From Swiss-Prot:
Primary location recorded for the protein, binned into one broad class: cytoplasm
Compartments it resides in: Cytoplasm
Description of how the protein assembles with itself and partners: Heterooctamer of four alpha and four beta subunits.
CDD domains: Asp_decarbox
Protein's UniProt name: Aspartate 1-decarboxylase
PANTHER family: ASPARTATE 1-DECARBOXYLASE
GO molecular function: aspartate 1-decarboxylase activity
Assigned protein family: Belongs to the PanD family.
Amino acid sequence: MTITMLKSKIHRATVTEANLNYVGSITIDKNLMDKANILEYEKVQIVDIDNGNRFETYVIAGEKHSGVICLNGAAARMVQKGDKIIIMSYCDLTIDEANKFNPTVLFVDNKNNIEKLTNYEKHGEII
């Protein structure tokens, strides 16, 4: 038996673009992808903090250190430029693996610069 666990999370990223006419996906700054342990073409869940939308897409790499977070294609209708989003990927692990596993959690500022990288998320409110 396996269980689906949080693998990677980029918390409170700011949407820099929404491009309806691009082939569907989310473009993420390659540096953020590398630090968060997210691969190109990996399936991700997006949660828009501002409007509550939740949806899935896949990742394409954006220019390193550009801060780009761009929703493309149909996903562009789910967000607006400036929205805060949470980007999450998951993995399937056995129970034994899950008990030893820690996710990669990346906190970013308003310009999508890395503020904190951790393997643990303290539960509580962010002010």
